[in-house]
Amino acid sequence: MTARKSYTYPIFTVRWLAVHALAVPTVFFLGAITAMQFIQR
C-alpha cells in the first residue's frame, strides 16, 4: 500500500487541485450572482 501511495500521490494531488480550482470559483460566482439579485431587489 505504501508503494502505491508514492505513485498515486501526485495524480491524487493534481486531481484534488483541479477539483478545488473549479469548485472554489464556481461557489464564489454563485454567491456573487445571488447577492446581486438580492441587492437589486
UniProtKB/Swiss-Prot annotation:
Cellular location(s): Plastid, Chloroplast thylakoid membrane
Comment on bound cofactor: With its partner (PsbE) binds heme. PSII binds additional chlorophylls, carotenoids and specific lipids.
Recorded GO MF terms: electron transfer activity; heme binding; iron ion binding
Highest taxon above the source species: Eukaryota
Keyword Metal-binding on entry: yes
Gene Ontology cellular component list: chloroplast thylakoid membrane; photosystem II reaction center
UniProt cross-references to InterPro entries, sorted A to Z: PSII_cyt_b559_bsu, PSII_cyt_b559_CS, PSII_cyt_b559_N
TM regions (residue ranges): 16-32
Protein residues bound to heme: 20
Reported cofactor(s): heme b
Pfam families referenced in this protein's UniProt entry, alphabetically: Cytochrom_B559
GO terms, biological process: photosynthetic electron transport chain
Keyword line: Chloroplast, Electron transport, Heme, Iron, Membrane, Metal-binding, Photosynthesis, Photosystem II, Plastid, Thylakoid, Transmembrane, Transmembrane helix, Transport
Membrane-topology annotation of the record: Single-pass membrane protein
Biological role: This b-type cytochrome is tightly associated with the reaction center of photosystem II (PSII). PSII is a light-driven water:plastoquinone oxidoreductase that uses light energy to abstract electrons from H(2)O, generating O(2) and a proton gradient subsequently used for ATP formation. It consists of a core antenna complex that captures photons, and an electron transfer chain that converts photonic excitation into a charge separation.
Summary of subunit composition and partner proteins: Heterodimer of an alpha subunit and a beta subunit. PSII is composed of 1 copy each of membrane proteins PsbA, PsbB, PsbC, PsbD, PsbE, PsbF, PsbH, PsbI, PsbJ, PsbK, PsbL, PsbM, PsbT, PsbX, PsbY, PsbZ, Psb30/Ycf12, at least 3 peripheral proteins of the oxygen-evolving complex and a large number of cofactors. It forms dimeric complexes.
This protein's name: Cytochrome b559 subunit beta
Source species: Chlorella vulgaris (Green alga)
